[in-house]
């Protein structure tokens, strides 16, 4: 998508602090971290949000990436995955992305 910041990051047009990349996904540190370990896991193919995804294998792959990145960051013993969907769900960028949060004790409910 032409004006999508995550599409531009995925294509390399905009730099990011990458922690993972393959042909389907990229993971990079969030610019406004909410935890010591806060990484965004983003499919390279543009989907506005999770309701647009019709590829179960891709969603499974994104979960595997999350697990791998959590291990890489040393937070596999405790982390949270969050997918905000739509404006009311707190989605700020209209490109599906998964927040991986860890590195400290996380509270529940989150808000």
Task: Provide a role label for each language-model segment.
Residues 1-111:
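HIT superfamily nucleotide-processing domains
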């Amino acid at each position: 998508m032409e004006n999508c910041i995550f599409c531009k990051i995925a294509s390399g047009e905009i730099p990011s602090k990458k922690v993972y990349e393959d042909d389907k996904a990229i993971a990079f540190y969030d610019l406004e971290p909410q935890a010591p370990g806060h990484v965004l896991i983003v499919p390279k193919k543009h989907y506005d949000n999770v309701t647009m995804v019709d590829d179960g294998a891709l969603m499974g792959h994104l979960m595997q990436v999350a697990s791998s990145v959590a291990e890489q960051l040393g937070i596999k013993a405790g982390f949270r995955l969050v997918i905000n969907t739509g404006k009311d769900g707190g989605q700020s960028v209209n490109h599906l992305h998964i927040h991986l949060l860890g590195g400290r004790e996380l509270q529940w409910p989150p808000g």
